């Protein structure tokens, strides 16, 4: 343990040292040139408190939060104390602030701490926290003099002073509050109310207003669900009304949709449009998370939230329905609701032939990722590949799918009638390539970690019977049989559930309570000791390699000791009826007289063939004969009760009921077969999981649309390609005016929109465009830092942008390029452009900049805790340099075949990303050398050279980057991350995608001044960097990931009883148990290789929708667990018909655009020409786009439209839509701009 601690400390020190070294390089570089600021604009943070300070630009929070956490022992409680201290002015986060600003900062800081200061919700999700006047909703501010001890509240509408007793608090939410998650969004409202109470403001009362505010909330939710979309939880109207009437603060919001309310309009302080952020807080926050809120309300003694009890009680009826006897779990078809054309359905809910649930976590699964056999990826024609997202029936909603070879593969029927189990992925690939698979009888097992059930609060369900369960169960069954044979029934009942290791002790305790002490003592204790000795000396040695046990050994073990049959050779008896078993016994013919050397033949009868296929018995056809060969022949005969020596079937063992009951074998056929065999036959696959394809895997460079090389405005002067070089060479006839930062070089006396003049090196001066005075001397109420300048040089040096001179200057320093794509205009507030030198160097490397000045690559997230060196291009020497000195068995690393445990911030890049990153490193070296005049730092020439370098990982909707270390390259189209760094970004692995950047790129090129000046502009930007991750300060979802090497027998027994997931928490080791030292993690299943399987989904390789749809239906025809007619119906209902309706509706309401300058028009000019540049004005939605799914829909109706009444209804709907299209466009489905307006 000391070694593990030392290694982890050394790893963290290295991350900190290298990060600091890169900060020094970036600081030195930026001080030399024209970057927006002379130092890196990303703050390196080591704790939540520091991240809060960097995110919200406040101070004194980090130290105080650390003190309170140490004092209170609870971060959430410390958060409420921070809120209180900020409002009271005891904690000064921005000097002396008036009351309304203290409240605003307090709520934002509180939310930032609750979200680990990773997401941008505290900045972007809360538009404002306002004090408002009761009855009017007018905003009220504190105009008292510093230090603001006695607030003076003044209405901003009329300027009158307002009594605090006549005020209330409102939180104005925006769309990005979604990034906080439901719990944090709900807690933000609770924090705001706590702030209100500390500030001494009255509670919000909707009855104070002349308008029906409660009805407004209800109408908004109903309208949103009807016209916009759905929430994770869709509350009833009664629930919304209950919240709206009783919430102590006003939940307000910015308009996020164009859709307006119809009934409750024109309320003075509210917009008519839907307020998506406010609705999300109510629905997914307060309503959905009411039970969690109640705990906080009680814990912190916050008054006014008693209505939450009624919210929770409304769900009690549903809970009562779930109190039935827990013997099964109902199929759940929610995952099928939005089936997309071209993305196949793999299994209907809980359908026979669907995925068989198996408990376990491989080194590349867990944290919402599941494992399937790589053969499955091939037999689905490559639709499902490494990193593809699946929408699943349970335990969660979605999962990333990854290859695991230590689970059972799919079983298929070939065109020659053979049934084959595809243990070898290479065989599966070959069969698919030759098109020899006729039907996929079974999809194989899906490996799901028990932690997923805990995290999703899903009841445990019976898993597939597997070797790791069997090997723990065998000794227990030997114990039970021994006790039953040798002890009275009352003693047996008392001892049967006692674990083997405590059996002798418990027997001794029981014996001490008997009247006949000698006889009783000799009985139970003697029996217990003999059983323990038998298990220790004879049984356990035979279980050393359960995966490699032969069928002869398995039969001998079960017949000798009466233990359940080995799961590898157990067939799916629960998928057939007892009468089917009798048919098999009557129809078979046996050749051979000893186990392991048998052959079973059946006449090629359709019913017998069906039964064998249902059982998943591998077999082949020889003329008119069905042949089952070893090892399956012996396995089948043993389970049917056949004795090869006598050539007869055994008599039924009617005395097995006690053992079958003890083992909770409920299925009628399994009980019947068990009695025939003379030993228990478990349900092989009691739980099936339905699934469909979700998002494809992804590994792709992030590009803006259209993609620029540099953030430099060129308007239309660069043509459609925005090519600055084209303008520079005089090849473009267009000119334009663009908005840029109004900075003047005092030395050159002209407009230079940079911090430092690139011509003379003088620091420029910011001017105000309203008064033409330096910003420092400006008296304007709202200074305007932007000037509209001519691209061409004019007579006024203050209003012309010297583009050609800037290009010439850049070419002198870094060379030239044929093409240099800029942007039409800057979207930031100051509109300060990037230096052109950076763009030229990017263009030379074929790299494209993102909105914040960085270069990014997007990948689907996949988890990885351990890696085999050769999988990722690591040599033993390189591995030792990275700190991997010993493998998982404690042996020194000397071979590429050894498996090592990753460190918490390690990542494995896909090759495509690594090749891109090589170009980025070369660009950064060029930048340092040619532009900044410094020595290069990377020296990277090939992907493997990236190993050991640091990157910055960033999730969408967040504002905190996390430093990661590259430890390998894999041939995949997703990336593997240690789950801890994934959780540090508040992301799991259910199909989410994140981005990475090179660390030096972020430090050199990122600037807040480039970010868009609009709501959400600060999202998806690395405002703060975490160099070293603290496992206590990450998304706690990952804490439930199991990190044990196996599961105890008790867990499987709990699963058979459908126990609550919480009962599993104490049975397995989870990451939460190792937060102090997250090393020594284990996994239950290994895989041959983390890159074994196809890597590019067929969905992406097929270009036409017709091809994708045909392939989807063809796969549906082949998979036994799927009904192709249902697939076609769902595709029409959830994809084609809504799209056709929406597109036809949008066509009539569309806007128009100029083909040349891209100007937008609600109503096009009568001339059809753009008044700005003379370009042609075009439609934005064309008839072909509006009707693109009409023909595929018609073909589906033609094929399936007469199946039932529901299909006939769909057929009528398609017919009506076709008539509507003809009315709009005519029979040729084409229309020009003139025709759109009815002109000839």
Curated annotation (Swiss-Prot):
Record has Hydrolase as a keyword: yes
An annotated GO BP: DNA-templated DNA replication
Q: Where is the signal peptide?
A: none
Query: Cross-referenced InterPro entries, in alphabetical order?
Result: PolC_DP2, PolC_DP2_cat_dom, PolC_DP2_central_dom, PolC_DP2_N
This protein's source sits in the domain of life called Archaea
Single GO molecular function: DNA-directed DNA polymerase activity
Q: Which Pfam families match?
A: PolC_DP2_cat, PolC_DP2_central, PolC_DP2_N
Q: Which reaction does it catalyse?
A: DNA(n) + a 2'-deoxyribonucleoside 5'-triphosphate = DNA(n+1) + diphosphate; Exonucleolytic cleavage in the 3'- to 5'-direction to yield nucleoside 5'-phosphates
The entry's keywords? DNA replication, DNA-binding, DNA-directed DNA polymerase, Exonuclease, Hydrolase, Multifunctional enzyme, Nuclease, Nucleotidyltransferase, Transferase
Q: What is its EC number?
A: 2.7.7.7, 3.1.11.1
HAMAP family attached to this UniProt entry: DNApol_II_L_arch
Q: What does this protein do, in the record's words?
A: Possesses two activities: a DNA synthesis (polymerase) and an exonucleolytic activity that degrades single-stranded DNA in the 3'- to 5'-direction. Has a template-primer preference which is characteristic of a replicative DNA polymerase.
Q: How does it assemble?
A: Heterodimer of a large subunit and a small subunit.
The text of the family note is:
Belongs to the archaeal DNA polymerase II family.
Q: What is this protein called?
A: DNA polymerase II large subunit
The encoding gene: polC
């Amino acid at each position: 343990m000391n070694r593990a601690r030392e290694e982890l400390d050394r790893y963290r020190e290295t991350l900190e040292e290298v990060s600091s070294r890169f900060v020094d390089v970036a600081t030195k570089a930026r001080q030399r040139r024209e970057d927006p600021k002379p130092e890196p604009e990303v703050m390196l943070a080591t704790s939540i408190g520091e991240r809060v300070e960097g995110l919200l630009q406040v101070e004194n929070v980090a130290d105080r939060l650390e003190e309170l956490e140490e004092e209170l022992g609870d971060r959430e409680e410390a958060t409420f104390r921070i809120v209180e201290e900020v409002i009271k002015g005891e904690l000064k986060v921005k000097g002396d602030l008036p009351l309304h600003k203290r409240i605003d900062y307090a709520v934002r800081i509180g939310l930032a701490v609750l979200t680990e200061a990773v997401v941008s919700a505290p900045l972007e999700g809360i538009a404002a926290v306002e004090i408002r006047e009761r009855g009017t909703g007018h905003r009220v501010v504190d105009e008292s003099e510093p230090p603001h001890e006695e607030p003076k509240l003044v209405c901003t509408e009329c300027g009158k002073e307002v009594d605090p007793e006549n005020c209330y608090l409102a939180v104005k939410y925006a769309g990005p509050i979604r990034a906080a998650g439901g719990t944090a969004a709900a807690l933000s409202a609770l924090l705001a109310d706590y702030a209100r109470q500390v500030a001494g403001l009255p509670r919000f009362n909707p009855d104070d207003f002349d308008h029906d505010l409660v009805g407004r909330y209800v109408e908004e939710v109903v309208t949103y669900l009807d016209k916009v979309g759905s929430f994770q939880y869709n509350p009833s109207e009664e629930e919304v009304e209950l919240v709206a009437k009783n919430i102590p603060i006003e939940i307000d919001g910015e308009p996020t949709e164009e859709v307006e309310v119809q009934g409750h309009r024109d309320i003075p302080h509210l917009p008519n449009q839907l307020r998506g952020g406010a609705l999300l807080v109510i629905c997914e926050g307060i309503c959905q998370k009411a039970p969690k809120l109640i705990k906080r309300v009680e814990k912190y003694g916050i008054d006014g939230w008693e209505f939450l009890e009624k919210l929770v009680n409304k769900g009690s009826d549903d809970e009562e329905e779930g109190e039935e006897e827990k013997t099964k779990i109902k199929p759940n078809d929610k995952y099928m609701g939005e089936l997309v054309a071209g993305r196949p359905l793999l299994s209907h809910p809980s359908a026979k032939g669907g995925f068989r649930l198996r408990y376990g976590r491989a080194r590349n699964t867990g944290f919402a990722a599941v494992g399937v056999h790589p053969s499955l990826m091939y037999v689905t024609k490559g639709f499902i590949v490494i990193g593809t997202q699946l929408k699943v029936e349970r335990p969660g909603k979605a999962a990333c799918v990854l290859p695991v070879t230590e689970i059972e593969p799919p079983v298929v029927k070939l065109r020659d009638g053979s049934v084959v189990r595809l243990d070898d992925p290479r065989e599966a690939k070959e069969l698919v390539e030759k098109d020899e698979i006729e039907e996929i009888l079974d999809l194989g097992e899906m490996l799901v970690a028990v932690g997923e059930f805990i995290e999703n609060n899903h009841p445990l369900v019976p898993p597939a019977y597997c070797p790791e369960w069997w090997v723990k169960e065998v000794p227990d069954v030997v114990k039970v049989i021994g006790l039953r044979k040798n002890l009275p029934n009352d003693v047996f009942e008392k001892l049967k559930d006692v674990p083997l290791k405590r059996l002798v002790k418990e027997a001794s305790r029981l014996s001490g309570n008997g009247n006949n002490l000698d006889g009783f003592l000799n009985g139970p204790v003697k029996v217990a000791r003999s059983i323990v000795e038998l298990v220790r000396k004879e049984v356990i040695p035979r279980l050393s390699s359960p995966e490699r046990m032969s069928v002869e050994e398995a039969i001998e073990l079960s017949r000798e000791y009466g233990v359940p049959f080995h799961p590898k050779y157990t067939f799916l008896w629960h998928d057939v009826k007892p009468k089917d078993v009798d048919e098999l016994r009557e129809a078979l013919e046996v050749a051979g007289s000893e186990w392991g050397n048998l052959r079973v033949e059946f006449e090629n009868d359709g019913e017998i063939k069906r039964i064998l296929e249902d059982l998943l018995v591998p077999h082949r056809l020889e003329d008119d004969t069905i042949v089952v060969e070893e090892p399956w022949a012996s396995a089948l005969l043993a389970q049917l009760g056949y004795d090869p020596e006598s050539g007869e079937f055994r008599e039924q063992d009617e005395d097995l009921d006690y053992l079958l009951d003890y083992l909770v074998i409920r299925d009628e056929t399994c009980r019947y077969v068990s009695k025939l065999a003379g030993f228990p036959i478990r349900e092989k696959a009691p739980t099936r999981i339905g699934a469909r394809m979700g998002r494809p895997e992804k590994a792709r460079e992030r590009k803006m649309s259209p993609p620029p090389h540099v953030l430099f405005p060129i308007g239309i002067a660069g043509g459609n390609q925005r090519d600055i070089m084209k303008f520079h060479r005089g090849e473009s006839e267009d000119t334009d005016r663009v908005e840029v930062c109004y900075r003047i070089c005092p030395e050159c006396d002209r407009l230079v929109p940079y911090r430092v003049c690139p011509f003379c090196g003088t620091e420029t001066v910011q001017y105000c465009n309203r008064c033409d005075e330096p910003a420092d001397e400006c008296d304007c109420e709202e200074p305007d830092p932007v000037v509209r300048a001519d691209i061409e040089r004019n007579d006024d040096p203050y209003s012309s942008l010297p583009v050609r001179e800037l290009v010439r200057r850049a070419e002198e320093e870094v060379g030239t390029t044929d093409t240099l794509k800029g942007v039409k205009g800057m979207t930031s507030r100051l509109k300060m452009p990037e230096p052109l030198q950076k763009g030229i160097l990017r263009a030379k490397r074929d790299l494209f900049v993102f909105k914040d000045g960085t270069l990014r690559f997007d990948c689907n997230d996949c988890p990885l805790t351990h890696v085999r060196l050769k999988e990722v291009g690591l040599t033993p020497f390189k591995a030792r340099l990275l700190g991997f000195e010993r493998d998982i068995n404690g042996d020194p690393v000397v071979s590429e075949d050894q498996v090592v445990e990753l460190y918490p911030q390690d990542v494995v890049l896909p090759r495509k990303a690594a090749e891109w990153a090589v170009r980025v490193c070369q660009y950064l070296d060029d930048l340092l050398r040619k532009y900044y005049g410094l020595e290069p730092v990377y020296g990277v020439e090939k992907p493997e050279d990236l190993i050991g370098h640091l990157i910055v990982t960033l999730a969408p909707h967040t504002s905190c980057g996390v430093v990661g270390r590259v430890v390998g390259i894999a041939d995949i189209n997703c990336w593997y991350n240690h789950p801890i760094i994934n959780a540090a970004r508040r992301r799991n692995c259910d199909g989410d995608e994140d981005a990475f950047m090179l660390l030096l790129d972020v430090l050199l090129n990122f600037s807040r001044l480039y970010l868009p000046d609009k709501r959400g502009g600060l999202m998806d930007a690395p405002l703060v960097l975490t160099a070293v991750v603290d496992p206590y300060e990450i998304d706690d979802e990952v804490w439930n990931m199991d990190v044990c090497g196996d599961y105890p027998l008790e867990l499987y027994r709990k699963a058979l009883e459908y126990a609550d997931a919480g009962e599993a928490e104490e049975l397995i080791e989870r990451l939460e148990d190792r937060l102090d030292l997250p090393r020594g993690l284990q996994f239950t299943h290994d895989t041959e290789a983390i890159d074994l399987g196809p890597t590019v989904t067929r969905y992406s390789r097929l270009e036409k929708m017709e091809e994708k749809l045909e392939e989807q239906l063809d796969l549906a025809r082949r998979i036994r667990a799927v009904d192709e007619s249902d697939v076609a119906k769902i595709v029409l209902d959830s994809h084609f018909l809504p799209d056709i309706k929406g597109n036809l509706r949008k066509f009539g309401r569309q806007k128009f655009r100029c083909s040349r300058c891209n100007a937008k028009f609600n109503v096009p000019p009568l001339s059809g020409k753009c008044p700005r540049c003379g370009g042609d004005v075009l439609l934005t939605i064309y008839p072909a786009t509006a009707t693109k799914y009409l023909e595929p829909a018609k073909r589906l109706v033609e094929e399936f439209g007469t199946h039932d009444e529901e299909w006939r209804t769909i057929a009528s709907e398609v017919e009506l839509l076709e008539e509507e299209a003809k009315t709009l466009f005519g029979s040729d489905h084409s229309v020009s701009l003139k025709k759109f307006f009815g002109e000839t």
